Design a protein with these regions (language model features):
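Pyridoxal 5′-phosphate
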Residues: 1-250
Length: 250
């Protein structure tokens, strides 16, 4: 996401700018600090969608200088839950849609009743896990495995990696196509080989067409996590190479 693609839309009437911290489709990490600076110069607030960024990179709201950061713990080994950091003092000035009995201000205005205490326990455990392993260590581990995956896919004839072609400055997520086979067919064949991937648009529908993909079919998505090993990557590459060699009717 080029900075100018967002900044050029910002004007005197802009009140909020929403930008992704990282693409869940192809892993790109935009220069959110530059976008935030331009938005603030225009008098706008900024909310960063950090759902796909948080599990893969250390996130510092001070460096991002955003007003709101959102994430979800299901992306970092916890339960499904929405988490939002808000610049101190800002929440009191907001008027969110809320259920009638909820308070008019404070965090309670964004909640819908009794919290999921068991979910909060899971979030705490997941956060402790990330901190115990180390966010920098996780990023280094994932980047090394991701480079292995990306280089391996580039070496397989009939495979096209969608989006950026190198492993630098991105989350360890990519999309790829196999010539002559639909993404759904590729995912099914890989599942037969006990390799789990995702296919489709990954809810990033607007990004599919600029990437040269069908808006519904999308592509095959694969990614690296803290527990991914070199062996896992090699199994995926071997399975993809096998899929390429299979006849279309398969």
């Amino acid at each position: 996401l080029p900075v100018e693609a967002v900044v050029d839309l910002v004007g005197p009437a802009t009140r909020w700018v929403a930008v992704t911290g990282s693409s869940n489709a192809v892993g790109t990490i935009p220069d959110t600090a530059a976008i935030t600076a331009a938005a603030h110069t225009a008098g706008a607030r900024v909310v960063v969608d950090g759902v796909h960024l948080t599990p893969h990179r250390p996130v510092d709201v001070g460096t991002l200088d955003c007003d709101v950061l959102t994430t979800s713990s299901y992306k970092w080994y916890g339960p499904h839950a929405g988490i939002m950091w808000v610049e101190p003092g800002l929440l009191e000035s907001l008027s969110p849609y809320k259920v009638r009995p909820a308070p008019d201000a404070g965090p309670g205005s964004l909640q819908y009743g009794t919290p999921s205490w068991e979910g909060l326990a899971g979030i705490d455990a997941a956060a402790c896990f990330l901190l115990d392993v180390g966010l920098e260590e996780i990023a280094a581990h994932e980047t090394e495995r991701f480079a292995r995956l990306l280089d391996g896919l580039h070496e397989i004839d009939g495979v096209r990696v969608v989006g950026p072609q190198d492993a630098a400055d991105r989350a360890p997520t990519l999309m790829f196509e196999v010539a002559g086979k639909s993404p759904a067919a590729v995912a099914e064949l890989l599942a037969d080989a006990q390799v789990a991937v995702w296919d489709g648009h990954n809810y990033a529908v607007e990004a599919m067409i600029p990437l040269g993909l069908d808006a519904e079919d999308g592509a095959v998505r694969a990614g690296i996590s803290v527990y991914t090993t070199d062996h896992d990557v090699d199994r995926l590459l071997a399975a993809v190479a096998d899929v390429v060699d299979r006849p279309v009717s398969a």
